[in-house]
């Protein structure tokens, strides 16, 4: 299926959060993303692949650590091997060329973007931390079960526990997308994106910044 909209995107590294002043002398919390060394490694077209897309590579890697098929893939694009690769479906893939370098200037201040990343891993967590359960009462007969989930519903009917029931387990470390964030500022010289608010992931993790899928219209 061919994309019906133009999507711009770039891979970067989350450096952390800070505060900056806006034009109204108000402090704005922003996340700093460094997005350098992005190159186009492959182009998809509807005639050959059935859809249009652009593949982007990011991050340097020792060529000795790259498999032979991937090494040939990067060599065909005329670029050095990259550690991370992502594909974006877009209707304007013909506007790109193999080996083209992408910078943070593909975005502009005030633009709405979505940020995709891997959330922080929390390890094995109980239902109160993982799902926000209230727990059992502090008294009135409660005995060593204050943080337990309670009944999981497996009585003689239906004689089983339903799939997807909220229970204790590993928390975090999952792919997460934060929608409709605003690009506060761009530093092209240092390849930095300043994005209002928080984005998923820990410092040093790779994130994808792309054109917003949905845009919120005030008063609509």
Swiss-Prot record:
Q: What's one GO MF term for it? A: structural constituent of ribosome
Q: Does the keyword RNA-binding apply?
A: yes
Stored PROSITE patterns: RIBOSOMAL_L3
Q: Name one Pfam family in it.
A: Ribosomal_L3
Q: What are the UniProt keywords, alphabetically?
A: Ribonucleoprotein, Ribosomal protein, RNA-binding, rRNA-binding
GO terms for biological process, alphabetical: translation
Please verify whether the record's keywords include Cytoplasm. Answer: no
Q: What are the annotated GO cellular component locations?
A: cytosolic large ribosomal subunit
- Read off the Gene3D superfamilies from this record: 3.30.160.810, Translation factors (2.40.30.10)
Coiled-coil intervals: none
Which superkingdom, per the lineage? Bacteria
Q: Which residues cross the membrane?
A: none
Chain intervals for the UniProt region annotation (Disordered)? 137-159
Q: Which HAMAP family match?
A: Ribosomal_uL3_B
Assembly, per entry: Part of the 50S ribosomal subunit. Forms a cluster with proteins L14 and L19.
Free-text function comment from the UniProt entry = One of the primary rRNA binding proteins, it binds directly near the 3'-end of the 23S rRNA, where it nucleates assembly of the 50S subunit.
Family label: Belongs to the universal ribosomal protein uL3 family.
The protein in question is named Large ribosomal subunit protein uL3
């Amino acid at each position: 299926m061919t994309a019906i909209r133009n999507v711009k995107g770039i891979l970067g590294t989350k450096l952390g959060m800070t505060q900056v002043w806006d034009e109204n002398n108000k402090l704005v919390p922003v996340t700093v993303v460094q997005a350098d060394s992005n190159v186009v490694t492959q182009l998809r077209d509807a005639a050959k692949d059935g859809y249009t897309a652009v593949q982007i590579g990011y991050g340097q890697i020792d060529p000795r650590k790259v498999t032979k098929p991937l090494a040939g893939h990067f060599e065909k694009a005329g670029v050095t091997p990259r550690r991370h690769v992502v594909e974006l479906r877009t209707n304007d893939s013909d506007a790109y060329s193999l080996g083209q370098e992408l910078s943070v200037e593909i975005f502009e201040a005030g633009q709405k973007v979505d940020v995709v990343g891997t959330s922080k891993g929390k390890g094995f967590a109980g239902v109160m931390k993982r799902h926000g359960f209230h727990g059992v009462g502090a008294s009135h007969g409660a005995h060593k079960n204050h943080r337990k989930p309670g009944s999981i519903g497996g009585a003689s009917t239906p004689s089983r526990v339903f799939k997807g029931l909220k229970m204790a387990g590993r928390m975090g470390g999952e792919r997460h997308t934060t929608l409709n964030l605003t690009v506060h500022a761009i530093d092209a010289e240092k390849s930095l994106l300043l994005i209002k608010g928080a984005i998923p992931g820990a410092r040093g993790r790779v994130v994808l910044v792309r054109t917003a899928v949905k845009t919120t219209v005030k008063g609509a």
